[in-house]
């Protein structure tokens, strides 16, 4: 993109963008929730659509002059529905968190009981963490994973659900490397008379490509981010049955948000069109292949993988046998140009600020064009610096050499 005007108008921000672009080009990006959008998506986000206020929904706005942005929002909604075979879509949530809170606001009253996945077992802040508004306004009870297998014990979920009789069950995760059985969650929800919401933010791209069970076939409400594996702009969306459409739309506007971000909604539309292409399916297939290969290679280097491996785009590493915390591993890897995030592991003895693990994912490196052979190199980089932190210069050179093979925004 051309930043000639910005360079003159605001040299400080121009410099931030240049340095961040350099960092992205020169680093191996392994944060599972990050990706690299196309230039077409960025162009839509940087367009004149940012100037337009459009409170309301297409055809029912509170401002005049919305004829063109209505087209953009309709395209985004229609493409998203086609992508996931859904009856209704709301593309206005500014984030995945807003999408989740929007569903809660639509169907719950303060104090209602909800069953969600424990944050330290792979859930998300908005699934009832006590530090989040979800855990403050609603009575969240959590389920987790088995202590030995690190898999969801659906019979335990059923037992808890029958005990507490929640109004809503939330499925989905931010750090769970295995496939989730949405059909079983539907059966449990029906058994106790609960709504079922699935947060598919992390796996949306895999679902769109037909590589993971589609939660829209089972859930009353499905929320997602539009970035991560979906490779769109930062934002959120809600999919639901047509019978819930009005209550969901009302919960987002005027319930939770005011004016939608029309430039971002246009960028969402662009990314959804990209996701409907055959190339996108091939990309998602490679994401999974890369994650599986990276996991195998890390295991061969003595790393412990939570649940023993992965079915999706991410890996959760238990670093206790390496005598390093997640916090220190994140810092050490960052020093050589590998970006990961510290992450709690199930039944973690460390605090969330320290952690015993790191979460890594393959969406961003796959977007750059990396394949299985490159995962062998990445595993060597991670293994070498964790086991031999004194070899920082050598490993930094390995990172530089790998990144130079795969151009980014050039």
Swiss-Prot record:
Its cofactor is pyridoxal 5'-phosphate. InterPro entries: PyrdxlP-dep_Trfase, PyrdxlP-dep_Trfase_major, PyrdxlP-dep_Trfase_small, Ser_HO-MeTrfase, Ser_HO-MeTrfase-like, Ser_HO-MeTrfase_PLP_BS, SHMT-like_dom. The modification N6-(pyridoxal phosphate)lysine is found at residue 228. Catalyzes the reversible interconversion of serine and glycine with tetrahydrofolate (THF) serving as the one-carbon carrier. This reaction serves as the major source of one-carbon groups required for the biosynthesis of purines, thymidylate, methionine, and other important biomolecules. Also exhibits THF-independent aldolase activity toward beta-hydroxyamino acids, producing glycine and aldehydes, via a retro-aldol mechanism. (6S)-5,6,7,8-tetrahydrofolate binds at residues 119, 123-125, 351-353. Keywords: Amino-acid biosynthesis, Cytoplasm, One-carbon metabolism, Pyridoxal phosphate, Transferase. Belongs to the SHMT family. The keyword Cell inner membrane does not apply. The keyword Amino-acid biosynthesis applies. It is found in: Cytoplasm. This is Serine hydroxymethyltransferase. Homodimer. The record marks 227 as: Plays an important role in substrate specificity. Gene3D superfamilies: Aspartate Aminotransferase, domain 1, Type I PLP-dependent aspartate aminotransferase-like (Major domain). Pfam families: SHMT (PF00464). One of its GO terms (biological process) is tetrahydrofolate interconversion. One of its GO terms (cellular component) is cytosol. It comes from Alkaliphilus oremlandii (strain OhILAs) (Clostridium oremlandii (strain OhILAs)). It is an enzyme of class 2 (transferase). GO terms for molecular function: glycine hydroxymethyltransferase activity; pyridoxal phosphate binding. It catalyses: (6R)-5,10-methylene-5,6,7,8-tetrahydrofolate + glycine + H2O = (6S)-5,6,7,8-tetrahydrofolate + L-serine. Its EC number is 2.1.2.1. It comes from the Bacteria. Pathway: One-carbon metabolism; tetrahydrofolate interconversion; Amino-acid biosynthesis; glycine biosynthesis; glycine from L-serine: step 1/1.
């Amino acid at each position: 993109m051309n930043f000639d005007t910005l360079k003159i108008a605001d040299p400080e921000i121009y410099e931030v963008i240049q340095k961040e672009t350099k960092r992205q080009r020169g680093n191996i990006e392994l944060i599972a929730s990050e990706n690299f959008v196309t230039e077409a998506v960025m162009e839509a986000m940087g367009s004149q659509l940012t100037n337009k206020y459009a409170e309301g929904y297409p055809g029912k706005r509170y401002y005049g002059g919305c004829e063109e942005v209505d087209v953009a929002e309709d395209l985004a909604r229609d493409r998203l529905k086609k992508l996931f075979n859904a009856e209704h879509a709301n593309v206005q949530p500014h984030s995945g968190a807003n999408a989740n809170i929007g569903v809660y606001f639509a169907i719950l009253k303060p104090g209602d009981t909800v069953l969600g996945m424990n944050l330290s077992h792979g859930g998300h802040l908005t699934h009832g963490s006590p530090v989040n508004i979800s855990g403050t306004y609603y009575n969240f009870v959590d389920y987790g994973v088995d202590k030995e297998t690190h898999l969801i014990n659906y019979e335990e979920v059923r037992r808890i659900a029958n005990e507490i009789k929640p109004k809503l069950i939330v499925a989905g995760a931010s750090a769970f490397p295995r496939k989730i059985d949405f059909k079983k969650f539907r059966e449990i929800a029906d058994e106790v008379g609960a709504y079922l919401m699935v947060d598919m933010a992390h796996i949306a791209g895999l679902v769109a490509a037909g590589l993971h069970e589609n939660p829209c076939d089972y859930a009353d409400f499905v929320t997602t981010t539009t970035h991560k594996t979906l490779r769109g702009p930062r934002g959120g969306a809600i999919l639901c049955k047509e019978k819930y459409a009005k209550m969901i739309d009302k919960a987002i506007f005027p319930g939770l948000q005011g004016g939608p971000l029309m430039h971002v909604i246009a960028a969402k539309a662009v990314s959804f069109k990209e996701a409907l292409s055959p190339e996108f399916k091939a990309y998602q297939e490679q994401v999974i292949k890369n994650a599986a290969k990276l996991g195998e290679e890390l295991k061969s280097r003595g790393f412990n993988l939570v649940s023993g491996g992965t079915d999706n785009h991410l890996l959760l590493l238990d670093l206790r046998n390496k005598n390093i915390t997640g916090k220190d591993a994140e810092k050490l890897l960052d020093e050589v140009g590998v970006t990961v995030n510290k992450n709690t592991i199930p039944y973690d003895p460390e605090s969330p600020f320290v952690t015993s693990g790191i979460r890594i994912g393959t969406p961003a490196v796959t977007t750059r064009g990396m394949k299985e052979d490159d995962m062998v190199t990445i595993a060597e980089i991670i293994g070498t610096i964790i086991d031999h932190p004194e070899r920082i210069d050598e490993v930094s050179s390995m990172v530089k050499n790998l990144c130079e093979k795969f151009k980014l925004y050039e």
